[in-house]
């Protein structure tokens, strides 16, 4: 929704991962944490494709929103390097909300057609290995409380991101 409102191309890790595996984008495909489609090697391949697509968009003068976890500093630094290479502004949008909201949303999403296969257990494992964002300058790191609905959050985010961070 955000990318569409801003007129930015969206590259989603969930959609890219499933495309690489030859799966329909909204077909749920559950595997053990860091196995199969979610193994370190397949995850690396997924991020390589995300960066490839983003590079093409940026070099054609477009703007791109990378919708992915970016749980490690190394991946975020790789994205920042790509932006520098394309002479594009790099912004990190970190989404935060209470765990009870996260759990409820993940449980509800399990019954819907969705790109994402993440469930509560995946969230808990991701949380344990998440590397705090310390490598991005504060004026390029936007922390957003996403407790509210997308509809409620969108206008403020579009205002803030439409002209970059100030």
What are the language-model segments listed below?
Residues 3-62:
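Conserved substrate/cofactor phosphate-moiety recognition/catalytic segment
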Residues 15-18, 70-72, 96-103, 148-150:
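Conserved nucleotide-binding/hydrolysis micro-motifs of P-loop NTPases
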Residues 31-41, 85-133:
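A glycine- and Lys/Arg-enriched "phosphate-lid" helix/loop adjacent to the NTP-binding pocket
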Residues 60-64, 89-91:
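Loop/turn-to-beta-strand initiation segments
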Residues 70-71, 79-83, 88:
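Conserved P-loop NTPase nucleotide-binding/switch module
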Residues 111-156, 165-166:
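Small-molecule kinase domains that catalyze NTP-dependent phosphoryl transfer to phosphate-bearing small molecules
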């Amino acid at each position: 929704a955000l990318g569409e409102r801003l007129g930015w191309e969206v590259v989603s890790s969930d959609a890219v991962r499933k495309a690489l595996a030859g799966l329909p984008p909204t077909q749920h495909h559950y595997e053990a944490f860091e196995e199969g489609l979610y193994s370190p090697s397949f995850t690396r391949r997924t991020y390589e494709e995300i960066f490839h697509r983003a590079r093409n968009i940026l070099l054609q003068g477009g703007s791109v929103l990378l919708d992915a976890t970016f749980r490690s500093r190394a991946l975020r630094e790789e994205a920042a390097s790509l932006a520098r290479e394309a002479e594009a502004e790099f912004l990190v949008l970190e989404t935060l909300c209470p765990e009870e909201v996260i759990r409820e949303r993940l449980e509800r999403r399990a019954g819907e057609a969705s790109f994402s296969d993440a469930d509560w257990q995946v969230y808990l494992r991701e949380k344990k290995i998440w590397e705090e964002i310390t490598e991005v300058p504060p004026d390029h790191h936007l922390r957003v409380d996403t407790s509210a609905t997308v509809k409620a959050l969108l206008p403020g985010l579009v205002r803030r991101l439409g002209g970059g961070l100030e």
